[in-house]
Regions:
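Surface-facing alpha-helical segments and adjacent helix-coil boundary elements at the starts of domains
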Residues: 1-241, 265-273, 282-285
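Short beta-strand and strand-turn-strand segments in soluble, beta-rich domains
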Residues: 252-255, 296-310
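Short beta-strand segments of immunoglobulin-like
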Residues: 258-265
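Short solvent-exposed strand-capping/beta-turn motif centered on an Asx-Ser/Thr pair
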Residues: 277-283, 349
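Short acidic, flexible loop segments centered on an aromatic residue
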Residues: 285-296
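A beta-strand/beta-hairpin structural motif
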Residues: 303-330, 358
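Short glycine/proline/serine/threonine-rich loop/turn segments at secondary-structure transition edges
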Residues: 329-339
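Short beta-strand elements
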Residues: 349-366
Length: 374
């Protein structure tokens, strides 16, 4: 994450000071504290410094940033703390006028850098008032603003604080998605799909109901959007989601599941192959997935399902599938040594499993030989 943290660095802060063109001593001093901080912490640090240096009045803060928008250089990740400052100033003011204007300013800022993070505290403060304004963004001519309407109200937006009222009322954002699922911009539609996929974590029936409605009133992109939105439910084998996408229960046999090695040393990979046979009397549309059962820190196994392929098999037909799966340490996954397993999944149904070992790369150690001197 080191390179990511540098998205808000000394150069960016100095450029911000130059653009705002006013004495900002606390902001300048904050540069010395950036190094050990994460990107989120850097955004908070700069925002807190801006709140010290700028006037207390919300109107003065908003005017300073609207003036800065005239400069094309007022862009990039430094906009994150700007948005947080706007939110803090509006909540400090406490008036409905400041609240509404803060959301309007977020819409102006979002083409420079997404405002999806700073609007979360406004949603926390008054979700109904905020959603009323956000709903109006769905008809904006700016695709960045339309995307913000969906992305900023996601229930499990990565990096963002949770909005309890949205978690308690999952249906509250559906009108926003209904207005955007046929948007002309792929950028917006991807956000809609991810938003619906978020909801699928806890409310799969609601998600399938919404997706079914969209499929009954589609445009040329709706089928692809729905497939992306239901991806997690397909991996979980949720029957209504599978059937909506045309993956009905099928009579199939999975055989000859073969691994190219019984032991993977990190970093490394595992190659495998298997065959699927349609034993039924009709053609079968199949979602072919596989699950790796990873060893957790406590020694238990936890499955992670991966997409492999879609296929249509005629009655009696057989098809062979091959895949190579990489194993390497990542910030999002820590590997542990031990007995893992690989399993094939077809239309949400699991077919056996094959064990294999994962071995961590040995750390080099050196033993001093006194004969070699000190």
């Amino acid at each position: 994450m080191g390179a990511m943290n540098e998205l808000i660095n000394a150069t960016a802060v100095k450029r911000l000071v130059a653009i705002l063109d006013r004495p900002l001593p606390t902001v300048v001093a904050s540069i010395d504290s950036l190094d050990p901080l994460s990107l989120r912490e850097r955004a908070d640090l700069v925002s807190e410094a801006l709140l010290v240096d700028l006037p207390v009045s919300y109107d003065a803060v908003a005017t300073a940033f609207r003036d800065a928008l005239r400069d094309p250089a007022f862009s990039g990740w430094i906009i994150w703390p700007i948005g947080e400052t706007v939110t803090s100033a509006a909540l400090r003011d406490g008036s409905p006028e400041a609240f509404d204007d803060a959301l309007a300013l977020m819409a102006s800022l979002t083409s420079r850098l997404t405002s999806e993070f700073p609007i979360r505290r406004l949603l926390q403060a008054d979700v109904d008032r905020a959603l009323g304004i956000v709903q109006s963004w769905t008809s904006s001519e700016d695709e960045h603003v339309r995307r913000l309407a969906s992305e900023g109200t996601r229930h499990y937006l990565p990096w963002a604080i949770r909005v309890p009222a949205l978690l308690e009322r999952p249906e509250a954002t559906i009108p926003i998605l209904d207005a955007l699922y046929r948007d002309e911009s792929d950028y917006v539609r991807r956000s809609v799909a991810n938003h619906l996929n978020d909801l699928a974590r806890v409310h799969p029936e609601l998600v399938v109901s919404v997706a079914s409605k969209w499929m009954s009133q589609p445009d040329p992109h709706t089928a692809q959007l729905v497939r992306h939105a239901l991806r997690s439910l397909v991996k979980k084998g949720f029957p209504p989601a599978l059937q909506l996408l045309g993956y009905h229960p099928a009579e199939v046999t999975v055989s000859a599941l073969t691994l190219d090695t019984q032991s993977v040393t990190l970093p490394g990979s595992l190659g495998f192959s298997f065959t699927v046979t349609n034993d039924g009397p009709e053609s079968a549309t199949l979602a072919i997935d596989y699950a790796v059962h990873y060893v957790k820190s406590n020694g238990t196994l936890a499955p992670k399902v991966f997409k492999l392929a879609s296929a249509v098999l005629a009655p009696g037909a057989t098809q062979t599938f091959t895949k190579r799966h990489a194993f390497r340490q990542m910030t999002t996954r820590v590997h542990y040594a031990g007995s893992h397993a690989l399993e094939v999944q077809v239309n949400g149904v699991q077919f056996g499993s094959v064990p294999f070992e994962v071995v961590l790369e040995p750390k080099l150690s050196f033993t001093h030989d006194p004969r070699n001197g000190p």
